[in-house]
Amino acid sequence: MIVCVLDDLLFSVKISTAAKQMGADVYFERTPGMAAARIKEKQPSLAIFDLNSARLDPLGVVAELKSDPETRGIRTLGFVSHVHTETIAAARAAGIDEVLARSAFAERLGEILKE
């Protein structure tokens, strides 16, 4: 199971379509303030974050997950516009496992969902 924390419709459709084709189980959390609780509840193998989402506070959620013994082992991956170098640095400081440019994420989506 993969939990996606994003509110970008384009990427939601891309992920849903790829997951359906591969038979991957994906859950989308779009409710502000609920992402960390949902990830803790679902215990996914991967949590994917749109680091450009101001509404869903992905950096705060990643920091919360990585500071909790119950969730710190969950693999986290974020995608972000490559020009937002401060966001990339902040995500790494929060403890995210991997950060990809939006284009690289879209290109590697099938591979990411298989892992």
Language-model-detected regions and their locations in the chain:
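Output/docking surface of receiver
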Residues: 95-107
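Conserved phosphotransfer cores of two-component systems
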Residues: 42, 66-72
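Conserved phosphotransfer microenvironments
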Residues: 49-64
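Short hydrophobic/Thr-rich beta-strand motif most characteristic of the beta2 strand and flanking loop
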Residues: 24-30
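Conserved acidic segment of CheY-like receiver
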Residues: 1-9
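Alpha4 helix (beta4-alpha4-beta5 surface) of REC/receiver domains from two-component response regulators
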Residues: 83-98
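Acidic, metal-coordinating helix/loop segments flanking the phosphotransfer/catalytic sites
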Residues: 31-46
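A short, hydrophobic beta-strand element within the central beta-sheet of small alpha/beta folds
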Residues: 73-82
